[in-house]
Amino acid sequence: MADTIHWADVIAEDVLNKSGKHLVATGITPSGHIHIGNMREVVTADAAYRALLDRGADARFIYIADNFDPLRKVYPFLPESYAEHVGKPISEVPCPCGECANYSEHFLKPFLEALRRLGINPEVYRADEMYRAGMYTEAIKTALVKRNEIAKILEEVSGKTVAEEWSPFNPRCNECGKITTTKVTGFDPDAETVDYVCACGHSGTVPMAGGGKLTWRVDWPARWAVLGVTVEPFGKDHASRGGSYDTGKRIVREIYGHEPPFPIVYEWIMLGKQGAMSSSTGVVVSISDMLEVVPPEVLRYLIIRTKPEKHIQFDPAQPLLTIVDEYERLREKFRDNDPSMGEFEKRIYELSRATGICHPEIPFKQMVTIFQVARGNFEQILQIVKRSGFSTEDEKCIRELVDNVSKWLELYAPPFAKFSVKENVPVQVATLSELQKAFLGAFADLIESKGKISGEEYHMLVYSAKEKGSELNRLIAEKLNVPAPQVDPKDLFKAIYTSILGQSSGPKAGWFLSSFEEDFLINRFREASTYSPEKRE
């Protein structure tokens, strides 16, 4: 049975069964390149937030950068010198490029810029600042006092034994700066301090405010309570039986006296044949990199069109164009107020768009053709865009699309999507039949007589050649000095591509031909129609 209500609206309806204010939260650890797999979490949260607002809910949307998490290991993209920083909060690890305040900002800055380009504008929290500001102090105190109760919950839900020396709080060593090698030896609730001993040999006392952090399975429910989170998307790994959401539900209720947020569990985005994306394994296409290739609204559409619980197969090469085509067809139906467009499709389109981002009208595939015809020259591109019937008023948006296409051609385009316009009649024209050459001469005459022709008209004209009695068929017959010839349009398209590109195939013919000035086509086709290798020599 086809869906009639978008998943974001279903979530909003469920959430609104609980009255009051709503806080949609999302959080990602900026430990490496934040990839489009991570993007699913933020776009999902944004869609739920917008659906709540559309229903008049009192709602906020926040993003928490978990930059107080430790550096887990020396990732493949790091030099071995980072071994000494393993175990330190990533907000206190040096920036890999030396230009950002710290390691976490190196990955966070491009991610936040990518969110802006996607039209996503949450309130941004940084975990290290939250801890230092004392936002977690009461939660830390409660966790330390109720350590045994939390341990019991963890054992009952996860089925794993909690070590006797386990503590819900990881102090940061004053000597080595690590939070993964310390053990709590005592705490003072009144002074709000924690005593510890570290594997480096140092022991000391740290304040609860900024002197360390709660372990993940306690930090998450503590955050729900501290901030009042009511909705949160998260990956399926956290939703497994006995996983962090299951333990979090018990902890937030029994330890902190709050309700857990409405869960939106999402599946992974799979990168081609390489599997699920992961910053730590290097199977990744960063959001920033992808925004250099694809318009923002298409990336939003990739997430919005699919229910969170279904995995998404993503391939930035040729299959990407299928996604782009889908979105552009939706855009066209919406623009034309197509009666066949139902409310479900309209909702997908609405949630894929966002204010503050470019909405170019030119189809991506058509720009792939235009870019290569113009050899990347922006002024020529603008001329072709105008000649193709599109507005050139918003040059900024056109330039963004041009940049997307340029990068896609450079990084991902399969060989058959690439071409170059030959400056002279290609030698391959010698392989054309007499009928094909006659067609080129006749086509040149027809273009000259008609003047300006649209892409669609070019396409229809070529196909008209097979119709006996059509103007083009008659002109071909005159060139060959025969009665109405039998014509296969496939041979004619081959002649067009061969005469311009020196190859037997190319982009969609209508778009392709309308990208050229008529004089170029007339001259090229006439030259090709009389071409012979001897003549060229």
Curated annotation (Swiss-Prot):
Motif 'HIGH' region per UniProt: ranges: 30-38
PROSITE patterns (UniProt xref): AA_TRNA_LIGASE_I
Protein name: Lysine--tRNA ligase 1
Family according to the record: Belongs to the class-I aminoacyl-tRNA synthetase family.
Predominant cellular place of this UniProt entry's protein: cytoplasm
Keyword Cytoplasm: yes
Enzyme class: ligase
GO biological process, any: lysyl-tRNA aminoacylation
Motif interval(s): 'KMSKS' region: 276-280
Compartment list: Cytoplasm
EC number: 6.1.1.6
Domain of life: Archaea
Keyword Ligase among UniProt keywords: yes
Organism: Methanosarcina mazei (strain ATCC BAA-159 / DSM 3647 / Goe1 / Go1 / JCM 11833 / OCM 88)
GO CC aspect terms: cytoplasm
Catalytic reaction(s) noted: tRNA(Lys) + L-lysine + ATP = L-lysyl-tRNA(Lys) + AMP + diphosphate
Keywords per UniProt: Aminoacyl-tRNA synthetase, ATP-binding, Cytoplasm, Ligase, Nucleotide-binding, Protein biosynthesis
GO molecular function: ATP binding; lysine-tRNA ligase activity; tRNA binding
